[in-house]
Every structure is written in structure tokens, then in C-alpha cells.
Amino acid sequence: MADQLTEDQISEFKEAFSLFDKDGDGCITTKELGTVMRSLGQNPTEAELQDMINEVDADGNGTIDFPEFLNLMARKMKDTDSEEELKEAFRVFDKDQNGFISAAELRHVMTNLGEKLTDEEVDEMIREADVDGDGQINYDEFVKVMMAK
């Protein structure tokens, strides 16, 4: 499954993996998974976190290593994001629920994920997605970017 990913996708997933793997030991624990999910406004129980880990923990050691993470991401990409998942993701970014993601909102979520971006990087991300040029990302623009991944 993971062998159908491009090099770009793999390096993107490596970056995502390192956001989760806070201590850099090459494994994602339930604690690390919980930290990231809470920073995104989710509130999973210990049992839910354990279930998520168990779902992809091929070797049964209780953590997710990078190959297991890649398999998870490849599977997730195959069941391309449902409308509901996209709406949920958009809501995470659209803090004031006004239907637009501003540069400030994008920076806020990325900072919560531990991703410190310069103003230029944030502006560049907005520009890439901002089809109508109004300086923010609406839902349709967000969907386009997510589907292009």
C-alpha cells in the first residue's frame, strides 16, 4: 500500500510524523498522539487513543513507527477524504467560524502543532490556496488544496 506513494508524499508524511513524534525517538505513543489531537481541539479518551494506535500498530508494540504511519496515511488517502472529514478539518482552522481561514488562523493552528512558520511562509501557504485573491481561504479553496494532495 505504502509503495504507491510518491517521494514527495513520503517526505510530507515524514514531516507530519515528526510533528507527532515529540521526543524524536521514531515512535508515536498514545501520549504524543493525544497531545497533537488536543492541540487541534479534539478531546480523545485514553481508550480512543489506544484504539487508534492499535488500528495501525502492525508489530503490536503499542506505538506507531514510521512504516506503520505510512501505511495508515496511504490507507487514509485511498478512502479519499469524505465531505464530513473535510468540513471538520476546515472548522479546526476557521477559529472564528466566519467561513474563511485567515493568515492568523492558519498560523495559530500550525503553531499549536509545533510548526513555527515565518509570516512569509504563512502568506505563501495562503497564496497557494487563495484562488479568488481575497487574502484568505474559503471552503471551496480549502477542498481544492486538500484534494490535490
UniProtKB/Swiss-Prot annotation:
Binding site for Ca(2+) 2: D57, D59, N61, T63, E68
GO cellular component, one term: cytoplasm
Induction pattern: PCM5, PCM6 and PCM8 are not induced by touching.
Domain of life, per lineage: Eukaryota
Tissue: High expression of PCM5 and 8 in stolon tips and stems, moderate in roots, and low in leaves. Steady-state expression of PCM6 in all the tissues tested, except in the leaves where the expression is lower.
Name of a matching Pfam family: EF-hand_7
Binding site for Ca(2+) 4: D130, D132, D134, Q136, E141
Keyword Metal-binding included in the entry's annotation: yes
Modified residues (N-acetylalanine): A2
Domain EF-hand: 8-43, 44-79, 81-116, 117-149
SUPFAM superfamilies: EF-hand
This protein's UniProt keywords: Acetylation, Calcium, Metal-binding, Methylation, Repeat
GO molecular function terms listed in the Swiss-Prot or TrEMBL record: calcium ion binding; enzyme regulator activity
Record: residues binding Ca(2+) 3: D94, D96, N98, E105
In-chain residues carrying the UniProt-annotated modification N6,N6,N6-trimethyllysine: K116
Cysteine-cysteine disulfides: none
SMART domains in the record: EFh
Residues the record lists as binding Ca(2+) 1: D21, D23, D25, C27, E32
UniProt keyword Thylakoid present: no
Comment field (misc): The expression of PCM7 was not investigated.
UniProt xrefs under PANTHER family: CALMODULIN, MYOSIN LIGHT CHAIN 1, 3
Protein family membership: Belongs to the calmodulin family.
Function: Calmodulin mediates the control of a large number of enzymes, ion channels and other proteins by Ca(2+). Among the enzymes to be stimulated by the calmodulin-Ca(2+) complex are a number of protein kinases and phosphatases.
UniProt name for this protein: Calmodulin-5/6/7/8
Taxonomic path: Eukaryota, Viridiplantae, Streptophyta, Embryophyta, Tracheophyta
